[in-house]
Amino acid sequence: MAPLKVHGPVRMRSMQTGITKWKEGSFEIVEKDNKVSLVVHYNVGGIPKTFQLSHNIKSVTLRPNGRKLCCLMLTLKDTSFLTIDKVPLKDANEMRMYLDAVHQDRVHTAGKPSQGSGSFGGVLGSRTTQKEANRQFSYIENQAPPKRVTVESKDETPFRKVLGTPARASVKNSSGTGAPSNRVNVAASPTSSVPHRTGLLESRSEKRKRAQPPSSEMSEDYPKENDSSTNNTAMSDPAWKYLNSSREKQLKLKQEEENRTSGVLPLQSSSYYGSRSSSKEYSTSSSTLDRSSVSSQTTSAKRSLGFLSQPAPLSVKKMRSNQDYTGWNKPRVPLSTHPQQQLQGFSNLGNTCYMNAILQSLFSIQSFANDLLKQGIPWKKIPLNALIRRFAHLLAKKDVSSPEVKKELLKKVKSAISATAERFSGYMQNDAHEFLSQCLDQLKEDMEKLNKTWKSEPVPNDDSSPGRASDDLSATKVYTCPVISNLEFEVQHSIICKTCGETVTKREQFNDLSIDLPRRKKLFPSRSIQDSLDLFFRAEEIEYSCEKCNGKSAVVTHKFNRLPRVLILHLKRYSFNVALSLNHKVGQQVVIPRYLTLLSHCTESTRLPLTLGWSAHSAISRPLKASQMVNSCTISTSTPCRKGRFLRKEGLSELRSSTGRKNLNRVHVFKEDVQDINSSLQVQRGIRKSSKRSKMEGDKPELGNAGFDGMSEDELLAAVLEISKREASLSLSHDEDKPTSSPDTGFGDDEIQELPENLETMETEKPKAPLESGPANFTEITKDFDENKENKTPEGSQGEVDWLQQYDMEREREEQELQQALAQSLQEQEAREQKEDDDLKRATELSLQEFNSSLLDSVGSDEDSGNEDVLDMEYSEAEAEELKRNAETGELPHSYRLISIVSHIGSTSSSGHYISDVYDIKKQSWFTYNDLEVSRTLETTVQCDRDRSGYIFFYMHKDIFDELLETEKNAQPLSMEVGRSIRQPL
């Protein structure tokens, strides 16, 4: 016989709930309406989880687990995976046999009760005790028989589901055989006969006349017995139906009048009309609905029916029951959280949890986000597949876009990184710290390329030219690298000879620090992140050959030379066993303090983090105004400083060679109609006249009268156009950026639109308005024309028109080549996407298998970190007390505040799962990002739960943190109070 229940530790995995932890509970099989379901109960309480088994079982597996115990694993076709451990072998075998019968579609034979057969219905019937049967009979007698059962109780917890279900099955199967009634005091007895139930109808009608409780919510078992699918002749009588319907209508009207006086009319009327809509003749489909609704009634509702005077809560649940039709496990965002779209995570593209966790932690750094989006970076000038462009686009859209849109942006970010680091191109699990390092290095390279390209674009004037200050300002435009200004810091290593004291210093830049786990002492409390950091900066003795005295030993010290805004610490939790070739994760407990201090690792010359208002452009422009040139300076940017002077001939030729391709691209934006050409020629003639007047006034000493007199007309035209371009360069750059950049993000309207890759490429090159392509742009065409000696033509408009016609032919050829390249690229992209989809499916299945196996061993080792050769930090009693106090208050100088943790759940680096805990300064609350799922949490919970799995820690300088926090409090004093009440359900 298949057992009714099996007990043991339970774990589930489904699309709705994810992977749960091991909890004590039970598996219970419920059979109703020829359908079999599995109900999972937890000993700690809560809503049971129901899984349909009919036509949904994929496999059933038994795995021995000790003596006379085993583990039962059930895999469903809807990707759900259920496991119960430590089950007695006999019970597990019986349940497996029953599940195999359901899997082989033999549930009708397994569910019919017959003498001597191991029927499930017989088991359920026999498990109903006399006490429960009497209670059920007492309840049924005190309720009024309704005409129709509403679905108001579908959302209730099905604790008593088993009691009613086997009784109905037994009645239906035994009524035809005429089995004698042995248990007349049980209303739902398997051997109850039809005449006995008819007598119950009469007694219930008399009781209903004396006491009239709300029938739509208090009577639910009775219609199940009187269902039309049974052989009950009393209910098939039309006269009985008519009388019962009339009585029900009178009861409803009377109850509506009573509830109207109590102020619950809207909910009651909703319930009333809901019941009227279902008052049709009984049929097979309606009986199925009645059974499903009755089976979900709770025990508490059956025991306290006399106190249900206000049906408002049930009416609300009735509205929710329609949404819960597919099961209680379906995740549904509360209505109050819909306006808060920023509380969304990132979709897992296939083992990309490492990427999602790192991105959420980086995006939570407000100063990093501001430096990336709000300094006016010319995104149009950056290649489409550059990581910094993809990175900024995702950051700008993450709080305002749907998960589908963000999923496409995530794919683009992954593609941009995979183009440089192929190890991230597939769908295998990767290390989060490796991804972080690659991401930061690639962002710095992109900013360096941008600054180098931007440096060569404007043409500088000489010292005596008008508008020189504005041109110098444009020429020295340097964009701030978000990585350098926020995350990069500098450490000075000092090697001191122990013999003669000779000191050799070396400076090194870091984006993060990889610190060792401190050695755990069994007699002392657990070590902290502060101990690991101090361990990294401890002085150590090395073998060193001194050039001065030929000494053989020296001491190395490490001190901060420049502090970062945000300090990233990578805790080395993995140790590689060379003998076994295994990568083992050390689950040693490490205390996570709220504040760290770098006081003992700084000197008097240590530079503080950059202020929030700092920018590389302002750092260069200020000394320019005093000296009018930049000879040498040291700034925290990814590019060297730009020189203030350019040689006239060499600088011009270098500029032309570096911007030749860009000028050709700019020509694409011009229209080709004759009116625009003629208007441009007229503007050119006007510029020529004005430039001659400026020549007579002596504005350019190096282009004096003697110089112009010795020039030909072609050379004169080139010189004059060069002057006009300098005068219009600043205004042109402003006009270009103004319509395409937003003040907050720098992305224009076309960037915000989600377009395919080829459409986005075309969007960046669409023509501008004729008003924006003024004389300065036309001078660039003429300059290219003058630069190319093969294309020189005699003076006159006809020669220029011939040149434009020749350029039209070149452009048509380029467009044809572009179309061919796009077609080939699309074919390659389709093939690549198909291959990626196949790889994704295989990788997902492999990852789930590895993750399930790793969870069994994911408790974590509490052994020593294996750093036997590493000395432990020793503090005096006063120092230890001071560090302990600072960990909570941050009162010491150079303190850093915890703002994010990236944790790894699993036993090896090749499997497991990454999540991130982030402190949101705007909301002043902690959130846990688990791929697409976001939940609110507490800082103490984060510190406690991540002490064995914390992998990467983000700490922000206390002064920067306090400044950002104060800014948010002053900016939104009222909205934050409203926001807290709205976001409370999270």
Swiss-Prot record:
Please indicate the residue ranges that the annotation assigns to the motif KEN box 1.
Answer: 32-34
Pfam family name, one? UCH
Q: Where is the UIM domain?
A: 712-731, 813-832, 835-854
Q: Where is this motif: KEN box 2?
A: 224-226
Query: Where along the chain is composition biased (Low complexity)?
Result: 269-298, 818-828
* EC number of the protein: 3.4.19.12
Q: Which GO terms describe its molecular function?
A: cysteine-type deubiquitinase activity; cysteine-type endopeptidase activity
Keyword terms of this UniProt record: Cell cycle, Cell division, Hydrolase, Mitosis, Protease, Repeat, Thiol protease, Ubl conjugation pathway
Q: What is this protein called?
A: Ubiquitin carboxyl-terminal hydrolase 37
Organism of origin is Gallus gallus
**Encoding gene (name):** USP37
